[in-house]
């Protein structure tokens, strides 16, 4: 059996992630220690008094990007040896049931980074991210909602989360 799955979610809106994962089946699974989900506000790793997480696009253009510094600091603090960092982005690999099964079976530790604005600074993708995921061919206001979809699909495949294992198929 795989090691217990621990998921750290980095978002500008951690309450959007925590609320749907705190009740019902996933809340009970968390209470029973079958998986651990921790939601963090990226602003907690900023160093300025305004807790600024966004910056203008390098070279100009419309929109803003998530700054790399707080993301690097957060991942450095949370990362373990077996950690995989996943970025929720419309440009990523399309999430499906087989990928959910792969993530559930591997156990270990995931850090899910929820994109926002026009995305994240490219240095984050190049240096930290192991996998870019999308939940479909559409754009959401931020990656928090997408991360809940991924977490729910993965968690229900962990043995013991559902009352009847046949329900996970």
Give residue ranges: language-model regions.
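Solvent-exposed alpha-helices and their adjacent loops that cap or buttress functional pockets
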Residues: 2, 102-106, 132
């Amino acid at each position: 059996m795989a090691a217990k799955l621990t998921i750290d979610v980095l978002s500008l809106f951690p309450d959007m992630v925590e609320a749907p994962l705190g009740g019902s089946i996933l809340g009970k699974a968390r209470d029973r220690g079958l998986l651990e989900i921790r939601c963090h506000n990226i602003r907690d790793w900023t160093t300025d008094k305004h807790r600024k997480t966004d910056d203008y696009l390098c070279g100009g253009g419309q929109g803003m990007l998530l700054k790399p510094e707080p993301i690097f600091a957060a991942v450095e603090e949370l990362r373990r040896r077996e950690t995989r960092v996943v970025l929720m982005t419309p440009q990523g690999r399309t999430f499906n049931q087989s990928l959910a099964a792969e993530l559930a079976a591997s156990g270990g530790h995931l850090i899910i980074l929820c994109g926002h604005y026009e995305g994240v600074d490219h240095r984050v993708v190049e240096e930290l991210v192991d996998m870019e995921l999308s939940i479909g061919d559409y754009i959401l206001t931020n990656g928090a909602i997408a991360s809940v979809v991924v977490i729910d699909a993965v968690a229900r495949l962990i043995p013991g989360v559902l009352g009847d294992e046949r329900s996970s198929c």
